[in-house]
A protein has these predicted regions:
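Conserved alpha-helical substructure of the radical SAM core
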Residues: 1-96, 101-109
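Activation segment
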Residues: 27, 73, 104, 128, ...
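A contiguous, low-structure linker/loop signature
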Residues: 110, 114-116
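Flexible mid-to-C-terminal extensions adjoining Fe-S/redox cofactors in radical SAM and related proteins
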Residues: 1-11, 285-362
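Hydrophobic pocket-lining residues within nucleotide cofactor-binding pockets
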Residues: 69, 101-103, 173, 202, ...
Length: 362
């Protein structure tokens, strides 16, 4: 919502780079599992990537994702480090998305360039890590090797946190995590010593399209449960919630009020398509989200400026149907996945007009 306040409109301020298609795991819930390969192609020239970044006047943040961005030393040296140094020189915030299972020295080597180290942590038990974390892998590693990665992840998170890195662990709300939310939260806070626990509902996208998602009722109960049992001294961030001030549901409003008033709680608007585009460093393809199945590739940096791509996306009927905003609650409405899953027949633009009228923001 900072872009709305500063520029009075949605603005491209965040670029996410897919820097590798390699990963040492094959999580059943991975949003990009279908793209994973055993060998990376050659990346585009970094000068082209720098040029496209230079053309974005309001760039605030950059995300590095994969695959596992820290898996391939070649990718780290040829793509990741150059991007990190570019961001550092320009004063851009950087988030690295990693599973934190790799040797610690790889993370320490880039620590000075990282503002947020983001890890997905959905493991209620070690057995779940061993099964779900490699659920889509055809040839399974030995159990001992899997457990070693789990211990490496815990140790890396704890050590990096102790050394001052901001480590943020994200948990997806789905049928698998629901029974274990308290244990997951305690492990993130006490064992991994993370600075923040992020919570997002799981939506079925591409590779993870067969997931057992939660009903709206179960999801709301899970959020209340987390608010009841959480460590109130640890920052919790809730994102992509399918709960909006403009939906006339009393239970929704009670939950939103609780989220607004509790200590160390933030509710985040979804950045995909509102402030962020994803760029593949190998093909140059640009997508609105890092999972892309709703919209597919919308352009390519070999041909177009990212600011032009973003403006063209905002002019589409799909984007227009989603791009509402409510100043009273600093809410930017749903993304494509949320609308299609929970509110296929809701006109959020009409809701926007009603909310502006009700709260006297014309």
């Amino acid at each position: 919502y900072n872009d709305i306040k500063q520029f009075d409109q949605l603005t491209l301020s965040n670029v996410e780079f897919t820097t590798t298609n390699l990963c040492n795991m094959r999580c059943s819930h991975c949003a990009v599992g279908y793209t994973l390969q055993t060998k990376d192609p050659d990346p585009l020239p970094m000068n082209l990537i720098y040029q496209r970044l230079d053309e974005i006047p309001n760039l605030r943040t950059m995300s590095i994702t994969g695959g596992e961005p820290m898996f391939s030393k070649k990718s780290i040296n040829n793509v990741v480090k150059p991007l990190l140094k570019y961001a550092h020189q320009r004063g851009i915030y950087v988030q690295m998305n990693s599973n934190l299972t790799l040797p610690q020295d790889r993370y320490l080597e880039i620590a000075e360039y990282i503002d947020v180290m983001h890890i997905s942590h959905n493991w209620g038990t070690i057995q779940e890590f061993a099964e779900v974390g490699f659920g889509a892998m055809k040839k399974q590693p030995p159990l001992k090797a899997k457990l070693k990665l789990y211990e490496q992840m815990l140790d890396n998170a704890s050590t990096l946190s102790d050394q001052g890195m901001f480590v943020s662990a994200e948990t997806m709300l789905n049928q698998n995590t629901l029974p274990h939310l308290e244990n997951i939260h305690k492990e993130i806070v006490n064992d991994m010593k993370c600075s923040r626990h992020e919570v997002h509902p799981m939506y079925p996208a591409d590779f993870a399209s067969q997931l057992n998602v939660l009903s709206l009722k179960d999801m709301k109960q899970a959020i209340h449960h987390l608010l009841d049992i959480r460590d109130k001294n640890t920052w919790m961030l809730f994102g992509t919630l399918p709960i909006y001030p403009c939906i006339n549901d009393e239970n929704d409003q009670v939950l939103l009020e609780r989220l607004r008033n509790e200590k160390n709680i933030t509710v985040r608007n979804d950045p995909d398509g509102r402030s962020r585009l994803n760029v593949n460093v190998f093909s140059g393809d640009v997508i609105v989200t890092d999972f892309g199945d709703e919209n597919g590739t919308i352009s390519n940096i070999k041909n177009d400026k990212l600011t032009d791509v973003f403006d063209a996306w905002l002019s589409t009927d799909l984007a227009k149907s989603l791009n509402c905003h409510c100043e009273a609650f600093q809410c930017l409405g749903p993304n494509v996945l949320v609308k299609n899953m929970y509110y296929p027949n809701t006109n959020f633009r009409e809701n926007e007009i009603a909310m502006h009228t009700e709260h006297s923001f014309q």
